[in-house]
Amino acid sequence: MDSATTSGAMELVAALLRGRVPPELMGGDGAEGRALVATLAAAVLGAALFVLWRRAAAGKKRKREAAAAAVAEATEVKARAAKGGEDEKAADDGRKKVTVFFGTQTGTAEGFAKALAEEAKARYDKAIFKVVDLDDYAAEDEEYEEKLKKEKLALFFVATYGDGEPTDNAARFYKWFTEGNERGVWLNDFEYAVFGLGNRQYEHFNKVAKVVDEILTEQGGKRLVPVGLGDDDQCIEDDFNAWKEALWPELDRLLRDENDASTGTTYTAAIPEYRVEFIKPEEAAHLERNFSLANGHAVHDAQHPCQANVAVRRELHTPASDRSCTHLEFDIAGTGLTYETGDHVGVYTENCPEVVEEAERLLGYSPDTFFTIHADKEDGTPLSGSSLAPPFPSPITVRNALARYADLLNSPKKTSLVALATYASDPAEADRLRFLASAAGKDEYAQWVVASQRSLLEVMAEFPSAKPPLGVFFAAVAPRLQPRYYSISSSPSMAATRIHVTCALVHETTPAGRVHKGVCSTWIKNAVPSEESKDCSWAPIFVRQSNFKLPADPSVPIIMIGPGTGLAPFRGFLQERLAQKESGAELGPSVFFFGCRNSKMDFIYEDELNNFLEQGALSELVLAFSRQGPTKEYVQHKMAQKASEIWDMISQGAYIYVCGDAKGMARDVHRVLHTIVQEQGSLDSSKAESFVKNLQMEGRYLRDVW
């Protein structure tokens, strides 16, 4: 309805209300005509008012959107200007620049990088510290060298995960850096230090940090202190603090004047805190929300997951088993999400209701309390320097925030204990918390918190007077709940609109006596599929690419080793091979070593594996049952029995794939493979080791381990 039409309608209504009825409307019986006129007047008036309301509402929406866009643009311009101005100021006033790089998977490396930068800013007022995500440092690979040549002093915080791999945000830099041997010596004026984050239980402990440190030295860089080897299996914060204390004297030498008055200044880290505003429920509905879950996003990643419904869920173990393993299918039709065989899926799920209710009780907040959360002040300037991570979307209720974004079940870090101590009203509890976080309390923290696997909520229950405000709780006490990664157990050739997950339930008793239920595995086990209810479960998910891929040539032989849920990617492999065979491809030999406890309890996908054998996608299935029969048999034992066949396949160019537990199974399999190569190839130990390493370098020995 245009403006002319609206105007005409209003004139007609006005005429009717004044009693002036157009003659053309008064045909026939007078009473009937008057009734018709009254009805028409009401209808026209209603339509006109509706149009005016829509126009006013649209105008308000456009104003809100324009205001929001203006604020966003102003904020971005302000940030760019501040960032550029800071760099220019550093160059103009002669202050030295220190770049602090980080490569992080869960946020710990980023947290250490920002914490060090904050403390360094307080120690060295004549230097500027800039914290940089390695992935954001260069838009193109070629820019890495160009930019690094301009750096004089840099600190690297890099984590290692999986099978000695870099984190997602460091992968591009690491690939460029490790493949550039032809650069020679080019970092002559470059000084650096590296701190690594890893877990000593894994075979390639801190591999990424060690490699980066070694190559920096080889290419001319000057190492300030030995590479720091943070061990998350113990207390990685202690490792970080020890490395940091060794670093300060070197930075003092480079960044301080002899008469610097701040030399003896004691630094006390501020407790990070988001700005939180509590709002009424009726106000929450009028505020814009940005959950970053809109399906059809150009790129789905950890920051931009898509919403996927659970289509299928079924138990894979038999009733005779005392454990549980779930087959789950996410429906990705219409989401824009795609995957390849061998990829991983990242799943964001929620803490279970009883855990959330306990957190609400300990914090003292009503579950339905609405609030907004911000990393800046009301005037737009950032809070706490640069140490705060971007907050989660809001407005949100306390219950939903605790369910979706707070890691409540892992053991608290020492920085969390310090934050709790600050807000403990009982002096004795505050002192105890500070002691556990101190160097003097190192052994007790290691025993009472780490070894006992006490969760954050268990620790908070022991210190009930510690009730931090929400802004502190989410910034300094509870880490952000991280996505859980699973090897996709399907192939798009067979299931293009579904992502299959094979998940073992985590349900165990900790040394402190708590029954620990895995956050994601519990959610998966209890998920409601769409085949059972229209009100089905859903989760934000995304795909992470993997190099765990079948050979490009399907005729190349493959050896697969994957007990338990390590079967997952191989189910996808075999679906892919079956599709290739049905398309006329000639398949090479394939053998799969699978293990479980008992064929009557946890032999998952048994019928499917037998079908792959019958259809020719799989040549041989070798089974190992650890709790069936007089002796325990594992996949590595079966490999030793098949040593000759394995060596023959390797000699024919076979690819070897291992999936499953990194701490036990993968190590044992690696040792057996080394023995097979040594004995079957008549090689000494060092040559056998070189042979296996070459297989890895050639991409013929791949591992998907956790």
UniProtKB/Swiss-Prot annotation:
Belongs to the NADPH--cytochrome P450 reductase family. Its cofactor is FAD; FMN. It is a single-pass membrane protein. It catalyses: 2 oxidized [cytochrome P450] + NADPH = 2 reduced [cytochrome P450] + NADP(+) + H(+). It is an enzyme of class 1 (oxidoreductase). Residues 1-32 are lumenal. Its main location: endoplasmic reticulum. The chain crosses the membrane at residues 33-53. Binds 1 FAD per monomer. This enzyme is required for electron transfer from NADP to cytochrome P450 in microsomes. It can also provide electron transfer to heme oxygenase and cytochrome B5. Residues 98-248 form the Flavodoxin-like domain. Keywords: Endoplasmic reticulum, FAD, Flavoprotein, FMN, Membrane, NADP, Oxidoreductase, Transmembrane, Transmembrane helix. GO terms for cellular component: cytosol; endoplasmic reticulum membrane. This is NADPH--cytochrome P450 reductase. NADP(+) binds at R323, T565, S626, R627, K632, E633, Y634, V635, Q636, D668. InterPro entries: CysJ-like_FAD-binding, FAD-bd_FR_type, Flavdoxin-like, Flavodoxin/NO_synth, Flavoprot_Pyr_Nucl_cyt_Rdtase, Flavoprotein-like_sf, FNR_nucleotide-bd, NADPH_Cyt_P450_Rdtase_alpha. FAD binds at R484, Y485, Y486, S487, T502, C503, A504, G518, V519, C520, S521, W706. Residues 54-706 are cytoplasmic. Pfam families: FAD_binding_1 (PF00667), Flavodoxin_1 (PF00258), NAD_binding_1 (PF00175). FMN binds at residues 104-109, 159-162, 197-206, 232. Residues 303-551 form the FAD-binding FR-type domain. GO terms for molecular function: flavin adenine dinucleotide binding; FMN binding; NADP binding; NADPH-hemoprotein reductase activity. Its EC number is 1.6.2.4.
